[in-house]
């Protein structure tokens, strides 16, 4: 039975399976795009990268980002399962001299990181992968004027007007969408 994944960005998912396909980009692509964006948009020469220990998505996307950015120009840290206080990581990022903060982590961790980054006035753009493309994150960032946030997204503006209008209406109708 053929299967089509719509959000499975890990390149390992379809390897060795002739019946499993994807329609989205993969992590090596989004990691490279985000690294290039950091360098091109912000003239970043140093990046702080934060991943969840043992999480294939988080660690993998950090690795793809660092490879494209230049590993020698990245500060890389991991946090363990169950972490709720990210203030030491935000402090570490601020003290590292980094120009951007990259954290491809879960929505739950992201909301906490955003709060703690705002509290400490992080002072650098925050970048993340497709998991942060969520109304939960938009709500968490709301009212935090000192947060400068950029994420990758599967949505392409202007693809089809008949699809775009009702999709925007649906996505904005409920913050859990």
Predicted regions and their residues:
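Extracytoplasmic/secreted cell-surface and envelope-processing proteins
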Residues: 12-16, 31, 56-60, 86, ...
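Loop/turn elements at helix/coil->beta-strand transitions in domains of secreted/extracellular proteins
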Residues: 1-3, 16-19, 42-47, 70-74, ...
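Extracellular/periplasmic periplasmic-binding protein-like sensory domains
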Residues: 114-177
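An alpha-beta-alpha
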Residues: 19-81, 99-100
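Active-site-proximal beta-strand/loop segments in catalytic clefts of secreted hydrolases
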Residues: 6-9, 24-26, 50-54, 77-81, ...
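Periplasmic-binding protein-like
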Residues: 1-7, 46-51, 97-107, 113, ...
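Beta-alpha junction/loop-to-helix N-cap segments that form part of ligand/metal-binding clefts
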Residues: 1-15, 23, 78-87, 107-111, ...
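Structural motif
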Residues: 30-33, 79-93, 161-163
């Amino acid at each position: 039975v053929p299967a089509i994944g719509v959000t499975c960005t890990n390149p390992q998912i379809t390897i060795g399976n002739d019946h499993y396909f994807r329609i989205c980009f993969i992590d090596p692509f989004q990691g490279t795009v985000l690294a290039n964006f950091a360098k091109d948009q912000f003239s970043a020469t140093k990046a702080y990268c934060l991943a969840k220990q043992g999480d294939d998505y988080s660690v993998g996307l950090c690795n793809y980002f660092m490879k494209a950015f230049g590993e020698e120009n990245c500060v890389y840290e991991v946090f363990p399962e169950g972490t709720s206080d990210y203030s030491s990581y935000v402090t570490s990022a601020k003290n590292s001299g980094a120009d951007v903060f990259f954290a491809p982590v879960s929505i739950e961790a992201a909301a906490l990181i955003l709060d703690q980054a705002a509290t400490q006035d992080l002072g650098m753009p925050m970048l993340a992968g497709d998991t942060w493309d969520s109304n939960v994150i938009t709500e968490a960032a709301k009212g935090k004027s000192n947060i400068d946030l950029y994420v990758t997204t599967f949505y392409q503006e202007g693809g089809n007007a008949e699809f775009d209008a009702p999709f925007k209406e649906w996505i904005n109708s409920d913050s859990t969408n």
